[in-house]
């Protein structure tokens, strides 16, 4: 399945408490269960006003379904085309 990066604009995200982040993670886990086998939440990176979420999913539609179930915004969805890291300099380019 393809891997995606989802951008979510959520003002004041950086000020969320650990308890709030835990609650959001539970909501996301529940939404994944409801959306079905075609989606997996990998991880999310929280910045001051945005979230960057990594998902493996059959397509963008199920990502939007997950967001609707959980009440999360979806400002952009980008399919990952390749992975580049320090080892890539030696010719080891990874593709999902």
Show the residue positions of the predicted features.
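Amphipathic, hydrophobic secondary-structure cores in small proteins
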Residues: 43-52, 63
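Acidic/polar N-terminal loop/beta-strand segments that form early-domain functional surfaces
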Residues: 9, 44, 56
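A short linear hydrophobic-aromatic micro-motif
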Residues: 37-43, 76
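Short S/T/G/P-rich N-terminal loop/turn motif that feeds into the first structured element of a domain
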Residues: 1-34, 40, 48-50, 85-96
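An amphipathic, aromatic/His-enriched active-site/gating alpha helix that lines ligand/cofactor pockets
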Residues: 56-83
